Amino acid sequence: MNIRRLPVLLIAALLYATAVHQLKDVPRPSMVREMEVALPRFVQVALAGGDRYLAANLGGFRALVASTEHMQPDNFKIQGRVQRDVAWLNPAHEDNYYIAAAILPWNGEVDAAQDVLRQASAARLFDWQPIFYYAFDLYHFKRDPVAAAQWLLQASPRVTIQTDRYAIENVAARWFEKGYEPRVAVGVIEGMANQARDSGFKRYLQTRAERLRALEVLREAAARFQSRADRPLRDLQELVGAGLLRALPKDPFGFGYALDQQGQPILLNAPTRKPK
């Protein structure tokens, strides 16, 4: 062990013990254990013996092993902080930006994901994928297809395979022309699933794509309903009553679907609260 690091480690241990002692009496909801708290950045570096890259790897591993199936909005908020910290410690961390793109925006943490992806885009000048996911989030979550297409075109010079470059430029052109549509989101998520090495993570992404396909079915039926009835939907069950769907599609995550103020079907990202 490096003796010169001993005082740093002792201070880190003292800070950690103090933080745990203060936090144990603070009331908080029951949460998934992997994402209960985000430590200050200087504490993370101190606990890693002053090595910011080791601290980034520890934070990235923490995000990787988190059990997303049982996490609540507060957990995802903490995961967003953890992954932002990893990006600050090592903006070129590959696993961190990939996990951020695949999980955070789909669970209400779009800004956290964009922060991670923006830093990865600047640090990984050889890698087009952080720019692609950043552009996709602008398109799908922020619903700003023009800005998304402009970002996507920045990825094109980094692509080494000519056919892939053409494909990216074609997507950018479609975003400029068409705007928001769920089927584009399905294609991106399925592409990420095909690249995923972990089988559990692959299934998670495939389920996410299945959920988006169901949303597309609802939106197409809602458009036909509005064309026939000359008014927007007031309730999703009207699609069944009008004979446009035999039954409403089920959300594989169990959260369900709803209508926005314009009568457009949307995804719910948390269980609906039943009135007491």
Predicted regions and their residues:
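Canonical positions in the second alpha-helix
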Residues: D85-V86, Q119-A120, Q154-R158, G191-M192
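Alpha-solenoid helical repeat scaffolds
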Residues: Y98-I99, Q114-D115, W128-A135, V146-Q150, ...
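Low-complexity, acidic interaction segments enriched in glycine
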Residues: W106, Q119-S121, E181-G187, A196-K276
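Structural signature of tandem alpha-helical TPR/SEL1-like repeats
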Residues: N75-I78, G108-V116, R143-W151, E181-R183
